[in-house]
Swiss-Prot record:
Similarity section: Belongs to the amidase family.
PROSITE patterns, per the entry: AMIDASES
Active site (catalytic residues): K74, S149, S173
Gene3D superfamilies referenced in this protein's UniProt entry, alphabetically: Amidase signature (AS) domain
Described function: Hydrolyzes indole-3-acetamide (IAM) into indole-3-acetic acid (IAA).
Top-rank EC class of the record's enzyme: hydrolase
Coiled-coil intervals, chain numbering: none
Pathway: Plant hormone metabolism; auxin biosynthesis
Name this protein carries in UniProt: Indoleacetamide hydrolase
An annotated GO BP: auxin biosynthetic process
UniProt cross-references to SUPFAM superfamilies, sorted A to Z: Amidase signature (AS) enzymes
One Pfam family from the record: Amidase
Length: 467
């Protein structure tokens, strides 16, 4: 067994020949087998993984590029290795021979197909409590949700079953599970990553994203996926101007989350960060007008198109009829049967609310000369599995989906890059994450800022899933 470190550190150790690629792979396989109860992984090919590791060792180039690094791919991303099911029964036998360009770029750089990650069915939820494939469990407390919809990838990375992972994020689905599992989650500027051969929710909002142990790992994977290998230069904290839009993003926080956020802000201020407390005008109304109308309207059209292009043998009605998770079935059927979102509402959301939301962010950054904004990724920590519709938050019963996506949803709708960082643990030892967002196209600078914040915060905890 070899020590499991970050992806960046593992590459260094492989290059130094501290251990072989096969030894690394055997260690990860043993961890995956020991942590099966988390239900983080849907599909594996240990024989194939061992063969690929041995080939790398024979060639003597482990650690060059991404050679020797097993990754976890969310089950809605085509890899050419694992079934691309979106964790829904009708697609259980869907195994595209051609991988997505994201997977292809990573494999070309030497990354290994480690596993397929369990997820919320069809990406339509944030708990990863999937009635078809079973609930994914939070590695910090297996009775709690890991977040979603990329919950399996986040749980696998947090448990160090895999050295990194690729999820998808429509409104929360990379950053939220990263926050609840205590790892780093990155949603890039919309359009930075290829989107082909990924089972969609909303083309206007969907993007792949990265879940990793640290920002340095995100940078390595981002450079390969984006094809933009620009060096991330260190940024001093002193002189950074970071916005705190308190009225929306800091409202009604769980006490433990509020304490972690206040502690983080105080720490960073003491290190030289200038915080600007100012709200983004009309943000809540603009986001509400753009959010669900776009996603709900686009989903049936996007899924039908995917099935026509890449499946052929499974119809849209087949997929809908076989949905097992009640929360997903209720949402999807309401749109299909009742036309919950009309064409007029959709066009208003896409042509009016969304552009105005994007303009509100641009004006806010320009007015206050900001480098980023900072807020708690979620207003609350992980809650018990099974509370898919409603959850008690600060003494009130609230909608589970709405409360968890509240803070991460607006920047998703605006197409902005966002990076969730773990900042601490609650008294119950549950992770708390905080997100920084930047303007569209500022991904490199946002990652550099994230690396500087991460170094100052110095969160270094992982769950002990093997004991």
């Amino acid at each position: 067994m070899v020590p499991i470190t970050s992806l960046a550190q593992t590459l260094e150790r492989l290059r130094r020949k501290d251990y072989s690629c096969l030894e690394l792979v055997e260690t990860l396989i043993a961890r995956c087998e020991a942590a099966k109860a988390l239900n983080a992984l849907l599909a594996t090919d240990w024989g194939g993984l061992r063969r690929r590791a041995k080939k790398i060792d024979r060639h003597g180039n482990a650690g060059v590029g991404l050679r020797g690094i097993p990754l976890c791919f969310k089950a809605n991303i085509a890899t050419g290795i694992f079934p691309t099911t979106a964790a829904t029964p009708a697609l259980i036998n869907h195994l595209p021979k051609i991988p997505s360009r994201i997977a292809e770029r990573l494999f070309s750089a030497g990354a290994l197909p480690g596993a397929s990650g369990n997820m919320h069915e069809l990406s339509f939820g944030i708990t990863s409590n999937n009635y078809a494939t079973g609930a994914v469990r939070n590695p910090w407390n297996p009775s709690l949700i890991p977040g979603g919809s990329s919950g399996g990838v986040a749980a696998a990375v947090a448990s160090r079953l895999m050295l990194g992972g690729i999820g998808t994020d429509t409104g929360a689905s990379v950053r939220l599970p990263a926050a609840l599992c205590g790892v780093v989650g990155f949603r890039p500027t919309l359009g930075r990553y290829p989107r082909d051969r990924i089972i969609p929710v909303s083309p206007t909002r969907d993007t792949a994203g990265i879940i990793a142990q640290c920002v340095a790992d995100v940078v390595i994977l981002d450079q390969v996926i984006s094809g933009r290998p620009a060096r991330i230069l260190p940024i001093p904290l002193k002189g950074l101007r970071i916005g705190l839009p308190t009225t929306y993003f800091y409202d009604d926080l769980d006490a433990d989350v509020a304490f972690a956020a206040e502690t983080t802000i105080r720490l960073l201020a003491n290190r030289g960060v200038t915080f600007v407390e100012a709200d983004i005008p009309h943000l809540e109304d603009l986001n509400s007008g753009a959010s669900l109308p776009i996603a709900l309207y686009e989903f049936p059209h996007a899924l039908k198109q995917y099935l026509d292009d890449f499946v052929g043998t499974v119809s849209f009605s087949d997929v809908i009829k076989e949905i097992r998770s009640p929360d997903v079935a209720n949402i999807v059927n309401a749109q299909i049967d009742g036309h919950q979102i009309s064409n007029a509402e959709y066009e208003l959301a896409r042509q009016s609310f969304r552009p105005r939301l994007q303009a509100a962010y641009r004006n806010y950054f320009r007015l206050y000369r900001l480098d980023a904004i900072l807020f708690p990724t979620a207003p609350l920590a992980a809650k018990a599995i099974g509370q898919d519709s409603s959850v008690i938050h600060n003494g009130s019963m609230v909608n589970t989906f709405k409360i968890y996506v509240r803070n991460v949803d607006p920047s998703s709708n605006a197409g902005l890059p966002g990076l969730s960082l773990p900042v601490g643990l609650t008294p119950d030892r549950l992770p708390v994450g905080m997100e920084i967002d930047g303007l569209a196209g500022s991904d490199h600078r946002l990652l550099a800022i994230g690396a500087a914040l991460e170094k100052a915060i110095n969160f270094r905890s992982f769950p002990d899933v093997l004991n």
